């Protein structure tokens, strides 16, 4: 986690020094590029800080969830458009939403799906294909996010939701240029548990990774155990 915080801070400080020196004043295109990098790193740092605070609140049972019947289509459409615009490689989304709603906190569910899409793009091949599907069982809204990425070993699948854990496949990809937060999947797991739901991973190395989320339907007590 310290490394994840130091890297964006170092980049921001480097850009600040370059701007302060005036060396880029006569090079507006390069100056704008570095300012964009600093903004991106600031966003990464802000996201990491929010994850740490949210996980801390979840662990201490102090995070309030505003669960309502939320529309899934607007959440997913907004996220797919965002990631298509920012991705540095081709990304194709295949969407099939049989279940149109879920009983959840709108903002936190959006963050969960965003984390899963972000991971799918980071730890993927040069051309990314992401399937997002939903369906409804008798007691659950079921949401799946599947990619054609590097995959995760069976050993890593057992620990991938632990705090600060990053699987070997992700580490390999990171050395090749991807970056990410070790808290990401723990954050996802904690938020889903706060919804009294469950998340599972299924993966084959070199082929795909699929995350499946079970969110209980709205009931008087809303207490289900898988």
Predicted regions and their residues:
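Glycine-rich ATP-lid/hinge loop adjacent to the conserved G-boxes
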Residues: 24, 165-179
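Short helix-loop "hinge" at the ATP-lid/N-box region of the Bergerat-fold HATPase_c
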Residues: 120-121
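Conserved glycine-rich
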Residues: 196-197
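Short conserved segment of the HATPase_c
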Residues: 152-165
